[in-house]
C-alpha cells in the first residue's frame, strides 16, 4: 500500500505512506533519476549513466571503463540532499578544475549554490580513479534521506534541474 502524497499545507512537498505510516520516499535516487531522464529528453547531447550499488561503496562507478567518459567535459551528479549545495571537495581533495570552476562561476552565483564538502559518492570515486575531468555533486531537493520522514521539494528539484541545464549550456 505504498503511496506518494502531496502535502496539503505545502503543495511543493511530496512524501510517502505505507499502511497509514510515513516511510522514506527514496528521494536520493528518484530525484537524480528524474533529473537525468528530463535532461535526456531536452538535451540529446548529454550522456547519462546510472551506477549500481552506490550506497554499498560505489561499486558500480569503481568498476566502470573510464573510456565511457572520453568525450565528456565534466560529470554532474544529482545526488545531494537539500538545496543549493555544490560539492566539489571530498576530504580536502578538490574534484573540479580551476578552468571549469571559472567557466560556471556566474551560473553558480545566479542559482545561489554554495560550496560544501561531500561524502562518499560516485563522482568522488570516479575522480579518485583518475577519470580526468571535473566531477561535481549537486543538491536536488530531497530532505531527511534514508528516514521515514524523507520528503521531496518539487521547487528545489526543479531549481537544481534548471541549474544543471544552464551549466550544460555554458
Explain the meaning of each model-derived region.
Residues 1-15:
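Acidic/His- and Gly-rich active-site-bordering loop/insert found
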Residues 13-23:
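A gly/proline- and charged-residue-enriched helix-loop-helix capping module
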Residues 21-99, 111-115, 122-124:
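Acidic/histidine-rich catalytic neighborhood of metal-dependent amide-processing enzymes
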Residues 85-86, 124-127, 144-149:
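Short active-site-adjacent structural elements
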Residues 96-108, 156-164:
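Gly/Ser/Thr-rich active-site loops/lids in small-molecule metabolic enzymes
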Residues 117-135:
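Short glycine-rich, acidic/polar surface loops and turns
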Residues 144-170:
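His/Asp/Glu-rich mid-to-C-terminal helical/loop segments that flank catalytic regions of hydrolases
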